[in-house]
Swiss-Prot record:
Organism (species): Pongo abelii (Sumatran orangutan)
GO cellular component: mitochondrion
Positions of the FAD-binding FR-type domain: 50-186
Gene Ontology MF terms: oxidoreductase activity
Signal sequence region: 1-17
CDD domains named in the record: FNR_like
Gene name in the database record: OXNAD1
UniProt name for this protein: Oxidoreductase NAD-binding domain-containing protein 1
This protein's UniProt keywords: NAD, Oxidoreductase, Signal
Length: 311
């Protein structure tokens, strides 16, 4: 897809010190939040609307005001946002998404969080990455949203990784297709935070190895390449990544070439099956259906297979 007409080059980061002083001004009144939520739900007519698809999915009660404090172009079709979240009680688990309420837009967006819970704890910031489509919330993000734009967010989702200190150590295999990388990047970043805790010899969850399989049409649509490679280089004994492109038409640059192959194969996934491994899959429905079925056929317990489809 073509990129949006207006993009903000480079990530514009908000300062940590500004968070506390600005938080009060970001809060919406309860009546405003209620009106925003109910109006958006009632006016949404799409059969494939986020609110309809996720109507039975658990959500937190907190609807928090948030302000856009940073934006960047992650690919020709994906724009990332940093949101300063006002409510101090707002929290999420790695892998979850937010209902995204936009003043003046009747349709509620649904976007996976791609940052780690630690970033929210430290800076009161969450990060989203939104693909350009004709869906009203995505159009707003790409064409209308600016720094200091105000929205409201609420956490939901049953696809997450939230181990407790006493839990048994697990390996993770993350399988991402396209923008399905978003919740898996949140999980990967959370895993890296857990590894840093281990390195500092703190008490906490002892995570095993993490393998990311990431597929996109071309290298230009492989999001967060530098972030992912930085984590691989920081934890070479623990984190590994293989990237896959299915419709590449240009030459792959030298830095990425060692990490790039064709489509993800069943054998590659099968080689990582063990009783200590959890599988997280996020991508287009045909992809998630294929890999979850293949894992079941290879006798991976259903409770070890977590998947989420993006539309």
């Amino acid at each position: 897809m073509a990129c949006a007409a207006v993009m903000i080059p480079g990530l514009l980061r908000c300062s940590v010190g500004a968070i506390c002083t600005e938080a009060a001004s970001l809060r919406l009144t309860l009546s405003t939040l209620r009106h925003l939520t109910l109006t958006s739900i009632m006016k949404s007519k799409r059969k494939t609307d986020h609110m309809e698809r996720t109507a039975s999915v658990l959500r937190r009660e907190i609807v928090s005001a948030a302000k856009v404090c940073g934006a960047a172009s992650e690919s020709p079709s994906v724009k990332s946002l940093r949101l300063l979240v006002a409510d101090q009680d707002f929290s999420f688990k790695a892998g979850q998404w937010v209902d995204f309420f936009i003043p003046g837009v009747s349709v509620v967006g649904g976007f996976s969080i791609c940052s780690s819970p630690r970033l929210l704890e430290q800076e009161r910031v969450i990060e989203l990455a939104v693909k350009y489509t004709n869906h009203p919330p995505a159009l707003w993000v790409h064409n209308t949203c600016t720094l200091d734009s105000e929205v409201a967010v609420r956490v939901g989702g049953e696809f997450f990784f939230d181990p407790q200190p006493a839990d048994a150590s697990r390996n993770l295999v993350l399988i991402a297709g396209g923008v399905g990388i978003n919740p898996l990047l949140s999980i990967l970043r959370h895993a890296a935070d857990l590894l840093r805790e281990q390195a500092n010899k703190r008490n906490g969850y002892e995570i095993g190895t993490i393998k990311l399989f990431y597929s996109a049409k071309s290298t230009s649509e492989l999001l967060f390449k530098k972030n992912i490679l930085d984590l691989v280089n920081e934890f070479p004994e623990k984190i590994a990544c293989s990237s896959h492109v299915t419709k590449q038409t240009t030459q792959i640059n030298a830095e990425l070439k060692p990490y790039i192959t064709g489509r993800i194969t069943e054998k590659e996934i099968r080689d990582h099956i063990s009783k200590e491994t959890l599988f997280y899959i996020c991508g287009p429905p045909p992809m998630t259906d294929f890999f979850s079925k293949q894992l079941e056929n290879n006798h991976v317990p259903k409770e070890h297979i977590c998947f989420e489809k993006w539309w």
